[in-house]
């Protein structure tokens, strides 16, 4: 006869626990939303500052020029010194794929939410197509330079024996080594991706300033791009410290910077180009009429 109150008390305790968990979940969601809002606002403000972007360009130059000096002050046996480390295989070797995936989603959301026009969205996304062409073209050019400047060597216990094989393909087919001037494609790609992502992400500050819709999904995609940009900076530093010869890294970074300048610094400002980031997205202030 006394089981009824006990069961009722148990159900009441369960309901209270469920309500408590519901309240806790709401608090956690509120905290996550607040952090997402605050983090995206601050990151947009930093990336949207022209002065800070110029300092960022100076930072990249300093990393490539002076970063190799750190090789004398770091542990050569660290995981980042291995060509087979996780970040090198999963991220650096596929840096353009990661950049296109994250940045493509950001550009798609920003442009379409700002204009609601498919044609304008496609035009802005075409910058990534140009970037892919730049990456493919640079890779082929680097291989051509290596072919034109190289020679074929056979590794022997006493050293290297020079062979007269005419090109890299026949040299490698014979089981030998082809040694030429190798421009660092990783340094080129990471430098190009860093400059490109910083340029594209800077638009978010204007987007927010114009009061355009900026829900949690868009802010999350933006912050993911910021995190990827930070990762590219870190991996660029690791690359210049642990891998490649000094001039190979400097030339790779210089070519990446030049490719960015030709596209974002010059061509994209022309009317027959894909357009610069933010072009045509925001209403211009009405200019005052001139009186005669």
Curated annotation (Swiss-Prot):
Segments in the Lumenal topological domain: 1-18, 76-94, 163-187, 242-249
Mode of membrane association: Multi-pass membrane protein
Site (Important for catalytic activity): 248
GO molecular function per UniProt: coenzyme A diphosphatase activity; diacylglycerol binding; triglyceride binding
Keyword line: Endoplasmic reticulum, Lipid metabolism, Membrane, Transmembrane, Transmembrane helix
GO terms for cellular component: endoplasmic reticulum membrane
Residues of the active site: 186, 244
Subcellular localization, as worded in the UniProt entry: Endoplasmic reticulum membrane
Topological domains, Cytoplasmic: 40-54, 116-141, 209-220, 271-292
GO BP terms in the entry: fat cell differentiation; lipid droplet formation; lipid droplet organization; lipid storage; phospholipid biosynthetic process
Keyword check for Chloroplast: no
Expression by tissue: Primarily expressed in heart and skeletal muscle.
Transmembrane annotation, as ranges: 19-39, 55-75, 95-115, 142-162, 188-208, 221-241, 250-270
Annotated function: Plays an important role in the formation of lipid droplets (LDs) which are storage organelles at the center of lipid and energy homeostasis. Directly binds to diacylglycerol (DAGs) and triacylglycerol.
Family stated for the protein in its record: Belongs to the FIT family. FIT1 subfamily.
HAMAP family xrefs: FITM1 (MF_03229), FITM2 (MF_03230)
Protein's name according to its UniProt entry: Fat storage-inducing transmembrane protein 1
Originating species: Homo sapiens (Human)
Classification lineage: Eukaryota, Metazoa, Chordata, Craniata, Vertebrata
Originating gene: FITM1
